[in-house]
Amino acid sequence: MNNNAFHFPVLLDAICKLIEDLPVKSDLIYIDSTLGEGVHAKAILEKYDFLSLVGIERDPQILERARQFLSIFEERITYFNDWFDNFFVNYPLNVKANFILVDLGISMFHYKGSKKGFSFLEDEPLDMRLCSSSCKISAAEIVNTYSKYDLEALIYDLSNEHYSRRISKAIVEYRKIKKIETTKELQSIISKVYPFSKVKINPATKTFQALRIYVNDELARLKRSLPFWVENLAKDGILAIITFHSIEDRIVKDFFRSLSCDLYAKISKKPIMPSFDEIKKNKPSRSAKLRVIKKL
């Protein structure tokens, strides 16, 4: 286990400001829908002793890391090993939440320590399942069995990758000779067909994003959860959602726009973005957007 994989909590100052603006500060329920390693939770629980945490995390490996990381707050925490959409659709608590946090980014542990193939920085098995028991198909199965047209649609629809046709064709041609098994193998296939002049990020970045989203059914879980997140807010409760790419951000934006102004209020018209200083300290935060809604 890599104990150095903990990352910085994104947009923490903005999140703390939301908590400080809650009208009542006594015996409040804070639900972290995407607990991960517990970095947001630790910072929040240290600062606000009037909060009790309900932490939801599907990956049992990372949930155990969170338990260890948050052990000094054990009496204030209830853990659920579940997908957040399952939790909220079948809401098990007898009280509404005062603050719900959703961080849709993948934990740095998954990139650096899980060995599940989320990153192409190391040569790992091409899996990408956050939970192997509930995710039916791995990334390796997708790239080795899906048709060229299905791969092209998947990559484009879930990442806006403009070279999805070239990439899908290259994948299908490569697997005629050899099964694609590792992250470096897939990265190499993609890099060879990507126009060099167009490279601003690693050529494999968007394809890996698309595969991860598809394998874990991320967009469907987000869409399913949104109405239940707002339904399970207490009066004056806050729902704060951090997104990291334009597809999920658009889903959140459109849902917030659909809510009745008589029942809910946006905290800010535009998403809250990380400061220049935060991006300097924590480069992965550069694509983060925080959208917030309050229940009236």
Curated annotation (Swiss-Prot):
Pfam families reported for this sequence: Methyltransf_5
Q: What does the UniProt entry say about where the protein is found?
A: Cytoplasm
Q: Does the keyword Ribosomal protein apply?
A: no
A GO biological process of this protein is: rRNA base methylation
Task: Keywords in alphabetical order, please.
Answer: Cytoplasm, Methyltransferase, rRNA processing, S-adenosyl-L-methionine, Transferase
Q: Which SUPFAM superfamilies match?
A: Putative methyltransferase TM0872, insert domain, S-adenosyl-L-methionine-dependent methyltransferases
Task: Detail which positions bind S-adenosyl-L-methionine.
Answer: G38, V39, H40, E57, F88, D103, H110
Enumerate the catalysed reactions.
cytidine(1402) in 16S rRNA + S-adenosyl-L-methionine = N(4)-methylcytidine(1402) in 16S rRNA + S-adenosyl-L-homocysteine + H(+)
List, alphabetically, the GO terms of the cellular component aspect.
cytoplasm
The question of whether Transferase is a record keyword is answered with: yes
Q: Which GO terms describe its molecular function?
A: rRNA (cytosine-N4-)-methyltransferase activity
Q: Any idea of its EC number?
A: 2.1.1.199
The task this protein performs is described as: Specifically methylates the N4 position of cytidine in position 1402 (C1402) of 16S rRNA.
Similarity comment: family membership: Belongs to the methyltransferase superfamily. RsmH family.
Q: What is this protein called?
A: Ribosomal RNA small subunit methyltransferase H
Organism listed in the record: Borreliella burgdorferi (strain ZS7) (Borrelia burgdorferi)
